[in-house]
Amino acid sequence: MPKISAVIITYNEENFIGRCLDSLDGVVDEIVVVDSFSTDHTEEICKQHNVRFIKHAFEGFRDQKNYALQQAAYKNILSLDADEALSDTLRESILKAKNNWNYDGYMVNRRNYFCGKWIRFSEWYPDRQLRLFYVDHGSWGELNLHERFMLSNGAKIGKLKGDLLHWPFTSHEDHTEKMSRYSKIGAQEYHKSGRTASIFTPYIHGIWGFMRTYIVKGGFLDGREGFRICSHYSRSAFNKYKLLRKLNKEAKKK
């Protein structure tokens, strides 16, 4: 039977990490936490569990996750964020995969919680993620904000039953602050990669972002929460491309 290393990166996750670690009990053979020098109680909560706790300066989400993979003792990896946890059904599904590992990686549906409600649409569910994989067959790639584990060509991918539970925001204010921060990071990453934006680009992405998430993806079926999520998404897309255009213009002046 193959052994599994759970790998998590953290920074000030005292409100979430305990639940995440509890959900891994009895499922994985090792838990590796790579922490970016948290200033809250993240470290002491982790050390109450059977965790290998490593401090490492933050390099961006993609690079930090690749560094964390290098610290794992086993080749089969379960990658989680600190604000995620395994549902009971997903726990059972991972144990079955562990007993009969037939794929290079496994997809899982992620279910997101927002201000008292599990979101069913709004492009937030099923929110498919590749989180269980054989590490030698891929790596974390793409942009640092939109990183994903990329398997090599020809890799076989299976599907796990159950949901990966996700608590991405603690409040409306937290949602607003994080989306603003993600817009800035996204614009900077796009600029580094050579992307450009015209005067129309922010409006196109902002309007289409709302239409896609609220209408096409059924965000209206999530009620008031769906409207808030889709509105924030639209505003974030607009701000990201507005800042990208600003960065493009500043670069031309140099």
Residues covered by each model-derived region:
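A conserved acidic beta->alpha catalytic loop
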Residues: 23, 27, 35-44, 81
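Catalytic-site signature of metal-activated, phosphate-bearing donor transferases
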Residues: 66-69, 76-80, 87-251
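N-proximal low-complexity "stem/linker" segments adjacent to membrane-targeting elements
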Residues: 1-23, 254
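Short, well-ordered alpha-helix to beta-strand connector turns
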Residues: 28, 50, 72-74, 154
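Acidic helix N-cap motif at the loop->helix transition within catalytic regions
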Residues: 18, 40-49, 89-90
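Residues at the starts of beta-strands that form the adenosine-phosphate
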Residues: 3, 29-30
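Glycine-rich, basic loop-to-helix element that forms the pyrophosphate-binding segment
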Residues: 57-72
